[in-house]
UniProtKB/Swiss-Prot annotation:
This is Ferredoxin--NADP reductase. FAD binds at residues 35, 43, 48, 90, 123, 285, 326. It comes from Streptococcus equi subsp. zooepidemicus (strain MGCS10565). PANTHER family: THIOREDOXIN REDUCTASE 1-RELATED-RELATED. Its cofactor is FAD.
C-alpha cells in the first residue's frame, strides 16, 4: 500500500526548513520534513547550541538551542498536518503521474511539491591534522560546544580565529579558570565588535602560532605544543580542555544526482525560488542566486515565497492569495 502523498515535502529540518514547514501549515498544507540528522534544528542545534545569535529579527540575542526550541514550538501548532522523518538521507526523486516519488536511505515518500532547505549539506569538523588527535576526541578535545558549564574552573585552550573561536573565548572568559586563544595569523577574522571585546577581555591571545603536537594520557590531552609561524619558537601550553574551532566542511554530495541545475553546493533558482525542475524549489543556503546573503534571516524571508509558489503549482485554479497570519489563527 502506497504511503500518503503530502502537499509539500521539505528536505532539511534546519531553521529555514522549520519555518517553511510552519508557513506551509499556516496555509493549510500537509507537510513532511525529511532530515538526515537525528534531531531537528540543523547546525545551530547540533553544532552551536550555546552560541549566541544576534541577527534574528526581534531577538537581540538567543542561543542556537533557544532558536530551535522556539521554531519547534511554533511548528507544533500544526502537528496534525506535519510529519517528521529523521535520520533519512534523500538519495533521489522522480516525477510519476504528476507527483514526486522521493527515495531516501530508508523509505519512499510521495509529495506534490518539494522545497529543498538542506543548507550546505552534511558537515564534519575541520581538525588540527595531528597524528594522535583522535585519541582525545572522545574526552576533553572538542570541535563544538554543547554546554559552557563543562569548562567552569578549567584551563581552556581554543584554536581558531573566526567568529566561533572568538565567541567561545569571550563566553568562557570569567567562567573558565583561564582562556588561551591560538590563531595562525596576527589578525582575527571575527566581527570587528567581537575583536574589540577580545582586546579588553582576560583572554590570552597567541598569534601567529600553529598547533605542533599534543600530549596526554588515558585519552585526555593535557599539553599542546604550538610553534610560531616562520620561526623556531615553540610554546607548550598546559590545559584541561582543548576546543578546535576551525569550522566545518560541508558536502551536498547527493545534490549532483538530483538532475537539477546547481552551482558548487547550492541549487540555481529563479527569483521565485524555483529550481530547474517545475515543482521543486530551494531556499536558504541550498539556494544560489546573485546577491544572496548567507544569513538565517535571509532564509526566513525566502520561505514564504517558496511555499506560496509551491501552492500555486499544486493548486493552480485555487485562489492562492496569501493572507496575514492574524486572519488565519484565532
Amino acid at each position: 500500500m502506497q504511503e500518503r502523498t503530502y502537499d509539500i515535502t521539505i528536505i532539511g529540518g534546519g531553521p529555514v526548513g522549520l519555518f517553511a514547514a510552519f508557513y506551509a501549515g499556516l496555509r493549510g498544507m500537509t507537510v513532511k520534513i525529511i532530515e538526515s540528522l537525528s534531531e531537528l534544528g540543523g547546525q545551530p542545534a547540533v553544532l552551536y547550541p550555546e552560541k549566541v545569535i544576534y541577527d534574528i529579527p526581534a531577538y537581540p540575542a538567543l542561543t542556537g538551542a533557544e532558536l530551535t526550541q522556539k521554531l519547534i514550538e511554533q511548528l507544533s501548532r500544526f502537528d496534525d498536518r506535519i510529519a517528521v522523518c529523521l535520520k533519512e538521507e534523500v538519495l533521489s526523486f522522480e516525477k510519476v503521474d504528476g507527483d514526486f516519488v522521493i527515495q531516501t536511505s530508508k523509505a519512499r515518500h510521495y509529495s506534490k511539491a518539494i522545497i529543498v532547505a538542506c543548507g550546505n549539506g552534511a558537515f564534519a569538523p575541520r581538525t588540527l591534522g595531528l597524528d594522535n588527535e583522535q585519541l582525545f576526541a572522545d574526552h576533553n578535545l572538542f570541535y563544538n560546544v554543547h554546554s559552557l558549564n563543562q569548562f567552569a574552573g578549567k584551563r581552556v585552550v581554543i584554536c581558531g580565529g573566526g567568529d566561533s573561536a572568538v565567541d567561545w573565548a569571550l563566553a568562557l572568559d570569567g567562567l573558565a579558570k583561564s582562556v588561551t586563544l591560538v590563531h595562525r595569523r596576527d589578525a582575527f577574522r571575527a566581527h570587528e565588535h567581537s575583536v574589540e571585546l577580545l582586546k579588553n577581555s582576560h583572554v590570552t591571545t597567541l598569534t601567529p602560532f600553529v598547533p605542533l603536537a599534543l600530549e596526554g594520557e588515558n585519552g585526555f590531552v593535557n599539553k599542546m605544543t604550538i610553534q610560531k609561524v616562520k620561526s623556531e619558537e615553540e610554546i607548550t601550553l598546559e590545559l584541561d580542555s582543548l576546543i578546535v574551532s576551525f569550522g566545518f566542511s560541508t558536502s551536498n554530495k547527493n545534490l549532483k544526482h538530483w538532475n537539477l541545475d546547481y552551482k558548487r553546493s547550492s541549487l540555481l533558482v529563479s527569483p521565485l525560488f524555483q529550481t530547474s525542475q517545475e515543482g521543486i524549489f530551494a531556499i536558504g543556503d541550498a539556494a544560489a542566486y546573485e546577491g544572496r546573503v548567507d544569513l538565517i534571516a535571509t532564509g526566513f524571508g525566502e520561505a514564504p515565497i517558496a511555499v506560496n509558489q509551491a501552492i500555486k503549482y499544486i493548486y493552480p485554479d485555487r485562489d492562492n492569495r496569501p493572507v496575514h497570519s492574524t486572519a488565519l489563527i484565532d
